[in-house]
A protein has these predicted regions:
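C-terminal ends of transmembrane helices
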Residues: 22-36, 84-98, 150-161
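Interfacial loop-to-transmembrane junctions
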Residues: 155-173
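Cytoplasmic-side transmembrane-helix entry/capping segments in multi-pass membrane proteins
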Residues: 35-46, 70-76, 98-109, 165-170
Length: 200
């Protein structure tokens, strides 16, 4: 039940973009088309989950073991950058078609603060490895959900006549705010589930 709570909370209640405001750059920059947002979401899900596993292991068995906790941020950035490069090389060799589809998104993931944020959050929350994997994957799903829904909103906005003063970034920010308000409706769901299943 604890894992279900982590899953629901990471996707809806504490959405990485709409509640914690991490990953705003791809949220605004890659959300013009649903196709590109789905590609970015898939790439982020893969890298975020893999990076969280590796950074958790590095934190637990290297940084904590040798008293090097102060190197956490630098170590995590190096791990994420290395993983992205490794994934890019493997995809290029194994599946050129998938590499072509995701190739433009992979370099962007290195600078996506959501990936680093999740790696640090699992350490701060003192999650074990399995909890960390569930949290990272759930957060990636929440990232993809927010990105794809927002891309759908932006595609619909292209079809309507928007007043001149509201065009461009103004309507984008207003739409992002409305989407964030919609996700606020999920606040309290995790608390309700804890009470319902006696986990509080």
């Amino acid at each position: 039940m604890e894992y279900i709570l982590i899953f629901i909370s990471a996707i809806f209640v504490n959405n990485i973009i709409l509640s914690q405001f991490l990953g705003i750059c791809p949220f605004l920059g890659v959300s013009k088309k649903i196709d590109t947002s789905l590609g970015m979401s898939a790439a982020v899900a893969f890298v975020m989950t893999l990076a969280t596993i590796v950074t958790w292991l590095v934190q637990t068995y290297v940084l904590n073991a040798f008293g090097l906790e102060y190197l956490q941020t630098i170590a995590f950035i190096l791990v994420i950058a290395s993983l992205v490069q490794m994934v890019e090389i493997i995809l290029k060799k194994v599946s050129p078609a998938l590499y072509q589809a995701l190739g433009i998104f992979l370099p962007l993931i290195t600078t996506n603060c959501a990936v680093l944020g999740v790696a640090i959050l699992v350490i701060q929350k003192d999650f074990n490895l399995l909890q960390s994997v569930v949290y990272a994957f759930s957060t990636a799903i929440g990232f993809g959900l927010a990105l794809t829904v927002f891309a759908g909103m932006r595609e619909q906005l292209e079809l309507v006549n928007i007043p001149k003063g509201m065009r461009g970034m103004a309507i984008v920010m207003l739409s992002a705010g409305l989407l964030s308000l919609a996700f606020m409706g999920f606040s309290g769901v995790d608390s309700g589930l804890k009470v319902l299943f006696g986990l509080d």
